[in-house]
């Protein structure tokens, strides 16, 4: 799903159709439809396959909402989608991502089972009226495989970029030096415990560490520095530093800035997650985010622009990227 949505996403952000409650409701409807489909309907089928594009090996994984055999003996991949779009406006080609997701599952399942042809069915459930609409398309395995291969070829430049970045980051972080002339009392011991926790067996997956230290010891750097060094040795991909207050958030940002200042060539990307109420570029009259395409120029057509903006952000290593210029 992530592969398909990353490459094929289009349209606008619309807060009316997103959110935690909406996702939970969608999951409940999925289970209801799957249960009603009967005994011959296999729900939540895990699929995995190995492919290669541009010399890069890929492992594609996902869960098909349902797989069954129809009356003609044809295997059908069922993709269920809940929607708030009025039933009269639901069209077969409403969202290319929906078909693409089912087609990728079809390619994986078809090769796995040695099938020559498969059908993909989209099942739309209208959440306000309980209407159910279904659309079916017929494919050969060759067509589905070609579609998946084309997606991977499109994604390959992004994968190459990420692989190159990981290699650069690993070399940089593994050689990271402590950014101060000396450790404070107790700071080295804490940093050592953090590093051992991050690199502990099995398979360098780490263990839990609970620690308590007095104010002024330099806890932020004592945690960030060894954790980043551990990432440089292949232990983990991302570091999440959670804070309860803005003051401790600033301490983490200052520590990252200090690390960068001590090594101008440091290969490190950091992101501060902030409530959208605080960073919204186009709030409504009451100062609240208005994530509706008809009200916000940033929400309108957002998914048509986001990948171009993301590439520009990754290409700009100086942090001068401005979302206003890209309207994202």
What are these regions (language model features)?
Residues 218-225, 246, 250:
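Phosphate-binding Walker
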Residues 215:
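The conserved Walker
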Residues 195, 220-235, 255-259:
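Walker A/P-loop NTP-binding motif
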């Amino acid at each position: 799903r992530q592969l398909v949505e990353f490459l094929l996403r289009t349209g606008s952000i619309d807060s009316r159709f997103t959110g935690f409650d909406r996702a939970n409701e969608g999951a409940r409807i999925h289970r209801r439809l799957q249960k009603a489909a009967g005994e011959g309907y296999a729900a939540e089928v895990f699929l995995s396959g190995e492919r290669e594009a541009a010399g890069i090996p890929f492992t594609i994984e996902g869960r098909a909402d349902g797989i069954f055999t129809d009356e003609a003996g044809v295997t059908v991949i069922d993709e269920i989608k809940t929607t708030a779009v009025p039933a009269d406006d639901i069209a077969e080609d409403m969202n290319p991502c929906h078909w693409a997701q089912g087609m990728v599952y079809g390619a994986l399942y078809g090769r796995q089972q040695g099938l020559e042809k498969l059908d993909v069915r989209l099942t739309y459930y209208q959440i306000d009226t309980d209407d159910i609409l279904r659309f079916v398309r017929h494919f050969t395995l060759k067509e589905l495989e070609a579609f998946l291969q084309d997606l991977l070829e499109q994604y390959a430049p992004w994968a190459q970029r990420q692989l190159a970045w990981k290699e650069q980051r690993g070399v940089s972080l593994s050689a990271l030096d402590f950014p101060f002339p000396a450790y404070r009392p107790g700071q080295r011991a804490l940093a050592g415990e953090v590093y051992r926790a991050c690199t502990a067996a099995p398979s360098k997956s780490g263990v839990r560490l609970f620690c308590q230290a007095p104010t002024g010891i330099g806890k932020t750097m004592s945690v960030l520095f060894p954790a980043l060094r551990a990432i440089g040795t292949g232990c983990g991909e991302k570091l999440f530093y959670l804070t309860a207050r803005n003051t401790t958030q600033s301490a983490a940002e200052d520590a990252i800035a200090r690390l960068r200042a001590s090594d101008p060539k440091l290969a490190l990307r950091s992101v501060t997650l902030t409530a959208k109420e605080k960073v919204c570029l186009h709030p409504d009259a009451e100062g609240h985010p208005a994530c509706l395409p008809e009200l916000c120029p940033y929400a309108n057509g957002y998914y048509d622009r986001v990948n171009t903006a993301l590439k520009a952000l990754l290409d700009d290593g100086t942090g001068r990227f401005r979302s206003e210029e890209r309207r994202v």
